[in-house]
């Protein structure tokens, strides 16, 4: 028998307890600008840390291979219904363990090994699972990649030309480092011209889509996948969505289970349900509107400070910065900013001469700082401090002065009260 006091983490494993405490301290003392990170609510974390962790539930609600699933069925049913309501669709699979798992399931459902897939190049802002040669999507399938035009927008002419030439079975519209707006209708027209399945990967913008502040893909795409963290502020996990296509929905069900997963993570599914409930509140729309305002506020300052922004600016929550003119690499800038209590990630830019481990760019975003309560004023300050460091990487005085200012700002805006 366990005791919550005797068998607490602190009493059982002080090394892990201390590591977690250090991470809690880091999250409080650092400004989080990684575009794919956010802060989950106490309610989400409470659900994820619940005794649902203990329950095996292979299958789907109402059709399990184990007994004793009547209560976890409630959690999964709520998660599905809330996801459907949030995105206005009639099918949602809440079982994928991650966005990559959701993408893999879609591949398995609609393609055969060797089929051609057209997706955004990783160097242009795509994702590993969109056909990168180092990923399953580029190894099992014949991957063709599109990029950006000279203005930093998706090169739709190239997409159409590649589709006509290679006749892909599936086209992927989505990104991990693109700051523009996707024209879903153009992608639909191109997909229809070659009879391809159109998949949207909305992992980065799902919260914006749900709030109605980013174009809705569902009138145009056959299927959409997303993560449940990032702009949705839920637990780390995946989600598959589609509308008015029961035949495809049936394929997605079996592609997840028994296709690529066994038992679902019921504690995570419960946490997803909580996050979807939070996202259905009117305050979530206000939050997403502020996410966009804060990204634009940083864009304005960074342009004034002479930092080039790929695509010329941002129309969503993220910015991809070309820091070539600073004389420093993305790797150097990421480390310097870390010492100054600003967390970012180095990122390749289009036609980057440096390796992905070094890069010439940085990717930043506004979701986490907006959750923290930052408004435009604070975001302008952060952007100026970021520029100070990026132009002076390795300058101990600049880094220390910046860190002190960031600590003061963080104390005024705690992550959790």
UniProtKB/Swiss-Prot annotation:
Its EC number is 2.1.2.1. It is found in: Cytoplasm. The keyword Amino-acid biosynthesis applies. It comes from the Bacteria. PROSITE patterns: SHMT. It holds the Pfam family SHMT. Belongs to the SHMT family. PANTHER family: SERINE HYDROXYMETHYLTRANSFERASE (PTHR11680:SF50). This is Serine hydroxymethyltransferase. It comes from Francisella tularensis subsp. novicida (strain U112).
């Amino acid at each position: 028998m366990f005791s919550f006091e005797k068998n607490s983490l602190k009493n059982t494993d002080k090394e892990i307890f201390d590591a977690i405490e250090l991470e809690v301290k880091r999250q409080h003392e650092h400004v989080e600008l990684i575009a794919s990170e956010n802060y989950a609510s106490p309610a989400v974390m409470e659900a994820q840390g619940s005794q649902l962790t203990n329950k095996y539930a292979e299958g789907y609600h109402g059709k399990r291979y184990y007994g004793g699933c009547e209560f976890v069925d409630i959690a999964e049913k709520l998660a599905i219904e809330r996801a459907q309501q949030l995105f206005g669709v009639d099918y949602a699979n809440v079982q994928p363990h991650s966005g990559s798992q959701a993408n893999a399931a879609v591949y398995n459902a609609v393609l055969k090994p060797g089929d051609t897939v057209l997706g955004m190049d990783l160097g242009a802002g795509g994702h590993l699972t969109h056909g990168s040669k180092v990923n399953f999507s580029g190894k099992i399938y014949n991957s063709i990649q599109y990029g950006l035009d000279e203005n930093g927008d998706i090169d739709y002419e190239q997409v159409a030309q590649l589709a006509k030439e290679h006749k892909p079975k599936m086209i992927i519209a989505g990104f991990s480092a693109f700051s523009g707006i996707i024209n879903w209708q153009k992608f639909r027209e191109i997909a229809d011209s070659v009879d391809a399945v159109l998949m949207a990967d909305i992992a980065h913008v799902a919260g914006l889509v749900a709030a109605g502040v980013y174009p809705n893909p569902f009138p145009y795409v056959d299927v959409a996948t997303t993560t449940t963290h990032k702009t949705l502020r839920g637990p780390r996990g995946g989600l598959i969505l589609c509308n008015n296509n029961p035949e495809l929905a049936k394929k997605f069900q079996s592609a997840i289970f028994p296709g690529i997963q066994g038992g679902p993570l019921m504690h995570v599914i419960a946490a997803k349900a909580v996050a979807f409930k939070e996202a259905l509140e009117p305050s979530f729309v206000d939050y997403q509107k502020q996410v966009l305002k804060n990204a634009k506020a940083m864009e304005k300052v960074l342009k004034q400070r002479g930092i080039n922004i790929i695509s010329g600016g941002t129309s969503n929550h993220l910015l991809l910065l070309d820091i070539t003119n600073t004389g420093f690499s993305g790797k150097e800038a990421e480390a310097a900013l870390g010492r100054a209590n600003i967390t970012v990630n180095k990122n390749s830019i289009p036609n980057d001469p440096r390796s992905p481990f070094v890069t010439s760019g940085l990717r930043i975003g506004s979701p986490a700082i907006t959750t923290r309560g930052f408004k435009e004023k604070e975001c302008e300050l952060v952007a100026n401090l970021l520029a100070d460091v990026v132009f002076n990487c390795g300058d101990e005085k600049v880094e220390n002065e910046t860190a002190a200012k960031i600590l003061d700002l963080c104390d005024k805006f705690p992550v959790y009260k």
